[in-house]
Structure formats: structure tokens, C-alpha cells
Amino acid sequence: YTVIGAGKERDDSHEAVLGRDRQPLAHLQKFYEQTEARGVAWGGFKFMIGHNLKVLQMLAADPDITIIYIWRENRLAQVASLIKASDTKNWAQTRRNDHVTRKVRATPRQISHRWHEYATFDHLVSQWLAPLSNPKVTYEYRELFQPGFEQKLCDFLGISYDKKMKSPLVKQSSNTIEERFEEPAPIRYYFHQLGLGHWLEDEL
């Protein structure tokens, strides 16, 4: 766990994480204040279900906050990324190194538990999100990589598009999802039995 500030400064000390968790809403308010002080047009943060319930409740209570909701149809790819990040504690891959090609060690049962959990999250969140009056938009993961996505997102936010906009992240593993696992054979069998063999193929 790492606290990342508006200026991308990182602090994974016990004191920083405890301070955030002790007062999550005050921490969030400070983030927005720092963002405003830097003079940026829009400031935001990545929030995942399970991060903090008080923040989730705050999002629903503040209609001025814009919500960009991302979900992923390929649950196998999603779980592969989750397990790899959890095992290595590397939650954001920003450079190419050995971590990119490292295989995931997981069984079909472990994957089944996780993907059903995340499918349930998405189902419940979509229902939670629908009645909110916040400005909001939903994208499926693959849409983020389509030509013109940055322009479309900027249009939604009402800000000028800059051609230099680019995510600092690099892809963590093979685009062919079954190649991400140390032992793909039982996983391949399992998902073909479920009629979800397409999850094993190229995602992008």
C-alpha cells in the first residue's frame, strides 16, 4: 500500500498509510486541495471497490464528483493481473523488466473464487451507480485502447485534448491470456468447460 499525492510523490511508510486510513475523507480533501493548488484543470484518483467504504459513500453523497467507471469483460485476464500484483506487491507497472514476463501461479479453483467475486462487484456497482446524479460514464477495459479514446474522454470532461497524453503504465503480461499462467492446461480445460474459452485468447 502506498500513498500517492497530487504531485505523484509516493510514501509507503506506516505513518502515511495509517494517517490515510484513520481519516480517509480528510485525506481525500487534502488531495483535492493539493490538486487545485497546482492549477490543474481536473484532478482525480483511482478507486477500487474494497479500498474504503467511507470514500465510496462520500462519492455517492457529492454530486459534483465525476465518476469514470471501468469494468472488464475478461475476468480471467482481470484475475491474472490481480493475483500477479498481489503476489509481487507491484500494483502499477511503469517500466519493462523481468516482472512483465513472470508467470502467474494459480489453480482453477482460486481463479473461480476471484472472478465470481469481481463479477459480483461489477453487478452491484452498476446498480449503485445508475441512480446517482453525478456526471458519470462507463467504459469496458478494451475501449481504453481504441484510437481516439483520450479525445473522447477529454470531450466528456470538457477539457482540451493534448496529444502528449499517455498512461505511464506498461502491459504486465502476454496479450494471450492463457500464456500468463505457469500451468495453463487445467485452466484451459476449466474455462472451455464453462463455455468461456474466449477468455484464454488475445484480449486486445
Predicted regions and their residues:
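Non-catalytic N-terminal targeting/anchoring module and adjacent flexible stem/linker
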Residues: 198-204
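Short, basic, helix/turn surface patches
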Residues: 30, 97-104, 167, 192-195
